[in-house]
C-alpha cells in the first residue's frame, strides 16, 4: 500500500508541473481545522499538487473532539472560523449548525452524489431535515479476540452478546495462583457508551426518535448495563479500567475487547508478534447486529461563494475513491460510498481473512440520529458505568431514571 501511495503522489506531482504556476501571493488559502494529531499531510500534499493555486493551512485545535467543538462555538461568536473543519459524529454538530455557521453539505452535492453515500451515514449526519456534513473517516465497533487465549481455554469465538459473557468467564485466569487475576476475559475502552448504544439497539431499544424526543430509560438500556455490572462483579471484566483496556489487550491481559475497526494499526503495533488476534463481527442480540457509525465528518463553514466552492472541491477530493482507498481506508476506516464497494481495495479486503468479517459488517451500519443531547447521554453513561462497575449493588434502574431526567432537563433548556 505504501508503494501505491508513493505512485499516487508521484503522479499528482508530475501532473501539477503541467498546470499553470501562480505566484505565491496569488494563492488562495483554505483553512482546515482538525485535532492536533490529525495531520493529513499526504492528503493535503496530493490536493495541492492538483491545485497549485491553493494553499491548505491545517490548524490543529486541541487534542480531542471536545476541544474542537469548544473552539468552533467560540469562533462562531468571534467570526474567526475555518473554511473546512473536522466534525465529530458523536456530538457538537447540532450546536455548530444552530449557531448558523455551517453550510448544509447537500447544497454542494448532486442527487447522484448524495445517493452514492451509504444511507446509514445520512442517518447520522442529517439535522433538522438537512444533510449537514459528509462522512469522512468512518468506523464501527468490532470484537477483537486473542486467538491464542481462546484456543488454550477451548473457547469458540463468540457471535452473540450472551456468548461473550460466557466466554469471558472461562477466559478469566489467575495464572500464578496468587489470588490476583492476571487475564480478564473481556473489557471495553474509554469510549464505552458507543458500544453500550450498539447493544441497546440490537436488543430493540431506540434512544433518539424521529420527532427529536429521547428515551434512555428503557428496558434494553437497563438490561445491557446490568450485564456489564454482573461481569464486573464476577471478575470477568475489570472494574473501571477502560482507559488501559487497549494496552491490556496488547499485552495479553485481556482476552476479548470491544474496539473500533480503525484502531487495528495501534493494536497491531502493540501486539507485534506476541500472539495472533482476530477482528470478528460485533456480537448479536436476538439475531440483530448493530454497527453504529463512529469517526468523523467534514463540514464547510460559511464564507463567500468562491471560497465555499473551493472548500467543496477539497472535501470532494478528501472523500474521493482514490483518496479514501489510498489514505483513509488504509488506516482501517470504512468505505463511505456504495461505489467504493466495487473498488479493488474493498474487494481485496473482503477476500482477506483478517478483514473479511469487518468489511462484511458494513451491511449492518447504523447511524443514530444526531441530537443536541448526544454529549449529555455520553457523559451520563460514563458516570453510570463507573458506579455500577465499582458497586455490584448499585440500583441500575434508578441510575437510568436519573439519566433520563438529566436528558429531559437539557432538552428543556436547549
Task: Give names to the regions the model predicted.
Residues 167-170, 211-239, 282:
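Glycine-centered hinge/linker elements that transmit conformational signals in sensory
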Residues 88-141, 156, 165, 181-188, ...:
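Hinge/lid segment of periplasmic solute-binding proteins
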Residues 1-30, 49, 401, 405-414:
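Short, low-complexity disordered leader/linker segments with a strong preference
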Residues 26-36, 54-59, 83-84, 132, ...:
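Short, well-ordered beta-strand elements
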Residues 122-123, 273, 277-280, 329-383, ...:
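Long, aromatic- and glycine/proline-rich binding clefts that accommodate carbohydrate-like moieties
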Residues 29-44, 61-65, 139, 191, ...:
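Extracytoplasmic "Venus flytrap"
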Residues 49-50, 55-57, 78, 152-153, ...:
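Extracytoplasmic/periplasmic substrate-recognition and gating elements
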Residues 46-117, 124-126, 148-159, 253-256, ...:
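Extracytoplasmic "Venus flytrap"/periplasmic binding protein-like
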Amino acid at each position: 500500500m505504501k508503494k501505491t501511495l508513493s505512485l499516487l503522489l508521484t503522479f499528482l506531482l508530475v501532473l501539477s508541473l503541467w498546470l499553470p504556476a501562480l505566484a505565491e501571493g496569488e494563492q488562495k488559502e483554505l483553512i482546515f481545522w482538525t485535532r492536533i494529531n490529525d495531520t493529513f499531510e499526504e492528503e493535503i500534499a496530493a490536493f495541492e499538487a492538483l491545485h497549485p493555486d491553493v494553499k491548505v493551512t491545517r490548524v490543529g485545535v486541541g487534542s480531542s473532539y471536545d476541544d474542537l467543538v469548544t473552539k468552533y462555538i467560540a469562533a462562531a461568536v468571534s467570526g474567526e472560523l475555518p473554511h473546512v473543519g473536522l466534525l465529530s459524529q458523536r456530538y457538537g454538530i447540532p450546536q455548530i449548525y444552530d449557531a448558523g455557521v455551517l453550510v448544509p453539505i447537500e447544497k454542494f452535492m448532486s442527487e447522484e452524489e448524495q445517493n452514492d453515500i451509504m444511507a446509514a451515514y445520512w442517518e447520522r449526519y442529517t439535522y433538522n431535515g438537512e444533510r449537514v456534513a459528509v462522512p469522512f473517516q468512518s468506523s464501527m465497533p468490532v470484537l477483537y479476540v486473542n486467538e491464542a487465549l481462546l484456543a488454550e481455554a477451548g473457547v469458540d469465538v463468540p457471535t452473540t452478546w450472551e456468548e461473550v459473557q460466557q466466554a469471558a468467564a472461562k477466559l478469566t485466569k489467575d495464572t500464578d495462583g496468587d489470588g490476583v487475576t492476571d487475564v480478564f476475559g473481556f473489557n471495553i475502552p474509554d469510549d464505552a457508551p458507543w458500544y453500550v448504544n450498539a447493544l441497546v439497539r440490537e436488543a430493540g431499544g431506540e434512544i433518539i426518535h424521529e420527532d427529536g424526543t429521547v428515551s434512555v430509560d428503557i428496558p434494553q438500556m437497563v438490561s445491557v448495563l446490568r450485564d456489564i455490572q454482573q461481569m464486573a462483579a464476577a471478575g470477568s471484566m475489570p472494574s473501571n479500567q477502560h482507559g488501559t483496556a487497549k494496552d491490556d489487550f496488547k499485552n495479553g491481559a485481556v482476552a476479548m475487547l470491544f474496539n473500533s475497526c480503525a484502531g487495528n494499526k495501534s493494536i497491531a503495533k502493540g501486539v507485534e508478534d506476541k500472539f495472533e488476534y482476530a477482528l470478528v463481527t460485533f456480537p448479536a442480540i436476538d439475531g440483530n447486529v448493530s454497527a453504529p457509525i463512529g469517526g468523523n465528518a467534514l463540514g464547510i463553514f460559511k464564507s463567500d461563494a468562491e471560497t465555499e466552492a473551493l472548500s467543496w472541491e477539497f472535501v470532494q477530493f478528501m472523500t474521493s475513491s482514490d483518496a479514501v482507498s489510498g489514505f483513509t481506508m488504509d488506516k482501517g476506516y470504512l468505505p463511505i460510498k456504495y461505489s467504493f464497494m466495487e473498488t479493488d481495495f474493498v474487494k481485496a479486503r473482503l477476500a482477506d481473512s483478517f478483514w473479511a468479517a469487518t468489511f462484511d459488517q458494513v451491511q449492518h451500519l447504523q447511524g443514530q440520529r444526531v441530537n443536541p443531547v448526544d454529549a449529555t447521554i455520553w457523559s451520563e453513561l460514563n458516570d453510570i458505568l463507573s458506579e455500577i462497575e465499582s458497586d455490584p449493588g448499585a440500583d441500575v434502574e434508578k441510575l437510568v431514571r436519573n439519566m433520563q431526567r438529566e436528558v429531559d432537563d437539557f432538552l428543556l433548556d436547549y
